[in-house]
Amino acid sequence: MKRTTLSLFAGAAALAAVTGFAAVSAPGDTGAETVEPAARLPVERTSLLCPAPSASDLAETTYTSFTPVTEGAEEKGTATLTAAADGAGAEAGKGGEDAESGKDGEDAKDGEEGKDGKDGKDGEPVLRPGAPGTPVTGTASGADAPALTGTAEGSHAPGWTVQQTTEVAAGTGRGLLGLNCTAPDTEFWFPGASTASGRTDYVHLTNPDDSAAVVDIELYGKDGVLKSTVGEGVTVPPGGGESLLLSTLTDVEQTDVTVHVNVRSGRLGAAVQALDDKTGGDWLTAAADPAGELVVPGIPADATAVRLMLFTPGGSDADLKVRLASPSGAITPAGHETVHVKAGMTTGVDLGEVTRGEAGSLVLTPTSGSVPVVAAVRVVRGEGGEQESAFIPASDPVGARATAAENRAKGTTLSVTAPDRTAKVEVTASAGTEGGTTATKTFTIEGGTTQNVEVPVPAGLKGTYALTVETVSGGPVYAARTLTGEDEDVASFTVQPLPDDRGTVSVPKAEQNLSVLQQPPA
């Protein structure tokens, strides 16, 4: 997002410099022109990347694609989601052989086995998205489903969202695993990973481009960096999807690990698949960029255990206030009023049953000076042998609009929080994949609270549907959507934060002024 955003702004600035100018004058200038607000225009192209869903033969995966209707978007467009190129273990300097022939090599066959899968075979799209406003689904079975790369253009681009949901009936990582497929970027932070016994965590890398990408993978534990040369200079082939087992990158067992993925050349999609022998598994997606204030939205009301993981990448320690935004207001968890995060070290804090049967979101703010941190929580639901876990990273706000592609008539919970000011949001349910008409509701979220809102359901719903959340006034607001499994005897679930869906971009207001090209040199 960093490189793409900077390029976009640079291009807009260059365009303004050549064909016009945004009126900017110092205070007191005579003849100063009024600065007009930037216009928000629909994007014309969107790329998304989905990791290989599972190495389990029991895996059943559903992909749901949805583009919301966006005012001002082009009338025509296309979108496709196809299998990434074959891959059998990332190449990494001296560690390349180990990454290919060890345990990771065996389990990183997703890309290679994709050749024989019924979905994406011979370059055929896994699904072909329909018109904006109606979600479309595709499926894959077993361990041979590959990573996917997708591109949407024209009318299909603004806010294009793809949800990948996998159900695994048994074994390590059983349960419900879900994520929103991500846009390519150049840097990712994953607090919440682990190299402890009983955990099997992989970092998945997907390259959308026609040239190889080179990436460094750094691990940080409770005492600082976990030294390893295996994660340096990992090469991901053009259009390929790869996975690396974290325990092959270091021989140190750590309960809480922060993974830093830094792309030297090219761009990638990245996600961590965290599988637990006892509490199932889920995807750990990238946390919001390091910041002094963070929000972790949508902790389930019936969570039986919540563990907060934090990391500060700078050279200064961070001290943070910990608050839970509940339906009745901000609450300070007993015994965890503040947390101290040492520079370059991962800190884990057990918050227990912090939500106590109510909707909740964690709000982290500095006690004094602001120091950038990243954060995520691991949530456990259920009791005994029926427990399952999921991860919620700190998120960016909803912004203009956020989108959740896959929702069901039962088992969908939408959590919305306004950590500071009261906000009004509009929630719209799309038509269903097999039928139904849209429905909309508006909610007011009081400042400092979190509400599990009563989501609208399409009239005559058949299949699954999409939700959009739009900020009407106030805010900022943060949101997360929880899906629960259909088997009521097992606490399977997955949570996806809902940041802005990148459907529109701010373009400075410019006016024609060719005289800037005729001014004599200084």
Predicted feature residues:
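Long, internal scaffold/assembly segments composed of regular secondary structure
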Residues: Q273, G280, A286-V371
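Short, aromatic- and glycine-rich surface loops/edge beta-strands on solvent-exposed regions
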Residues: A145-G154, V162, T255-V263, A359-T367, ...
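C-terminal soluble interaction/assembly domains
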Residues: T428-D487
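Intrinsically disordered, low-complexity Pro/Gly/Ser/Thr-rich segments with frequent PxxP/GP/PP motifs
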Residues: E124-A143, V225-Q254, T258, A330-G357, ...
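Extracytoplasmic low-complexity, Pro/Thr/Ser/Ala/Gly-rich segments
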Residues: S25-L148, A152-H156, D500-A522
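Hydrophobic alpha-helical membrane segments, chiefly transmembrane helices and signal peptide h-regions
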Residues: L6-A26, V259, R267-A270, L324, ...
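Conserved functional hotspot residues at active sites or interaction interfaces
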Residues: K2-A13, G20-G72, T165-H204, G269-P313, ...
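Short acidic, flexible loop segments centered on an aromatic residue
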Residues: L205-V225, M309-T332, P366-S368, S415-G436, ...
